[in-house]
Amino acid sequence: MAVSLWQQCIGRLQDELSAQQFSMWIRPLQAEMDGDTLVLYAPNRFVLDWVRDKYINIINQFFTEQMGNDAPKLRFDIGSRPSAKKPEPAPVAAVRVPNPQTKASVGTSFNTTEPVVNANHRSNINPTYQFDNFVEGKSNQLGKAAALQVAENPGGAYNPLFLYGGTGLGKTHLLHAVGNGIIKNNPNAKVVYMHSERFVQDMVKALQNNAIEEFKRYYRSVDALFIDDIQFFANKDRSQEEFFHTFNALLEGNHQIILTSDRYPKEIDGVEDRLKSRFGWGLTVAIEPPELETRVAILMRKAQESGINLPDEVAFFIAKRLRSNVRELEGALNRVIANANFTGRPITIDFVREALRDLLALQEKLVTIDNIQKTVAEYYKIKMADMLSKRRSRSVARPRQVAMALSKELTNQSLPEIGDAFGGRDHTTVLHACRKIAQLREESHDIKEDYANLIRTLSS
């Protein structure tokens, strides 16, 4: 009875949680009775701890309401329920691929004179990108959690997994980390990572060589296919057609697909609706620009890997001024380290100011409160004067709060200074706005998207 009630409990959780929260934390759970105990099996420790910390009260309350004193005890475990049957792995077709000794990436040639062999598909997975060296923060926590689950249960956890966000935020790192995780668990797994333009080039070459069937067999035989920057499929009708059928074939065989893009699937122009619809079949997760604490952690990790002692105050100084993406942070730190090695000077705040003076000057020039106000007003189609007015209607107040939150995150101005710039408001008003927008970014997909879009615009 308890197991059947678990299905009803799932229904309640689905009603109370966002679609992403439900897909991420509840859908992977499996339930089975063990005596008078209901055992909930999670795919990994991360999911187990999260569900136990965040949702245990809701689950207990549901069973108490339904069964009273007869409610089962709850226990959490990692893995699959013992009675769950594991499907037999699908047979992998033999395919013709390029000689792995050549410099070309896997899948770049379809010469029909080459022998038919089983492909070494994983030669383009970068072994340096691991979960252990991926710096986690609130901005990428869900993305990493989803990627971990896919690595442990490819084709079963979230399929497809769609990661989206701006350039240099770690999407590619996660793709390779998943690939390395899959290969660690199954050394014979056939995993392919590539940029979407490589898929297009392979298809064009196959058409030129009358080897399109070879192309199809190759891509439909892999255990996992990871394609970066899927937005480059835009307006390439034949490539979209081939990928559509490849996508369907892989999903039907329970083979894992992970895609990345710089924008939400439905916002990708020039891509067929049937593809965009399929992109959302599994789990879609945003990777956002790192918050201050994560930026500091990234700098400290990079410095440690480089054998450099980076003082905390220097890391905070850099992190507060460079906010757009991880790549920019690492590039700035590399410049600081190179200058320090060349001059023999210690790394201090004054030294960093000198080493990064052009970059810091550009950032200060680009991101000002006035610039933020104008950008937000234009984005929400309100008047610039509304940013300074006392109007409280939501159509005006919400954009104003967004602009205040962005001003706190993207400038070095204090709360009182931000309040002055918004019509002489008190610093507590600014603090309330920042907290409100932080809350809404957790609860509202629209606000989350708006905020991410504005940061990309202001940081570009």
From Swiss-Prot:
Q: Where is this region: Domain IV, binds dsDNA?
A: 341-460
A GO BP entry: regulation of DNA replication
Know the name of this protein?
Chromosomal replication initiator protein DnaA
- Coiled-coil residue windows: none
Could you tell me what this protein does? Plays an essential role in the initiation and regulation of chromosomal replication. ATP-DnaA binds to the origin of replication (oriC) to initiate formation of the DNA replication initiation complex once per cell cycle. Binds the DnaA box (a 9 base pair repeat at the origin) and separates the double-stranded (ds)DNA. Forms a right-handed helical filament on oriC DNA; dsDNA binds to the exterior of the filament while single-stranded (ss)DNA is stabiized in the filament's interior.
Q: Extract the InterPro entries matched here.
A: AAA+_ATPase, Chromosome_initiator_DnaA, Chromosome_initiator_DnaA-like, Chromosome_initiator_DnaA_CS, DnaA_C, DnaA_dom, DnaA_N_dom, DnaA_N_sf
A Pfam family cross-referenced in the UniProt record is: Bac_DnaA
Cell compartments where the protein resides:
Cytoplasm
**Any one GO cellular component localisation term in the record:** cytoplasm
Spell out the family assignment given in the record's similarity comment. Answer: Belongs to the DnaA family.
Q: Which parts of this chain are annotated as the region Domain I, interacts with DnaA modulators?
A: 1-84
Chain positions recorded as ATP binding sites: 168, 170-172
Q: Where is the signal peptide?
A: none
Q: How does it assemble?
A: Oligomerizes as a right-handed, spiral filament on DNA at oriC.
Q: Report residue spans for region: Domain III, AAA+ region.
A: 124-340
Task: Copy the domain comment.
Answer: Domain I is involved in oligomerization and binding regulators, domain II is flexibile and of varying length in different bacteria, domain III forms the AAA+ region, while domain IV binds dsDNA.
Residue ranges for the region (Domain II) are 84-123
Q: Name one GO molecular function term.
A: ATP binding
Q: Keywords, A to Z? A: ATP-binding, Cytoplasm, DNA replication, DNA-binding, Lipid-binding, Nucleotide-binding
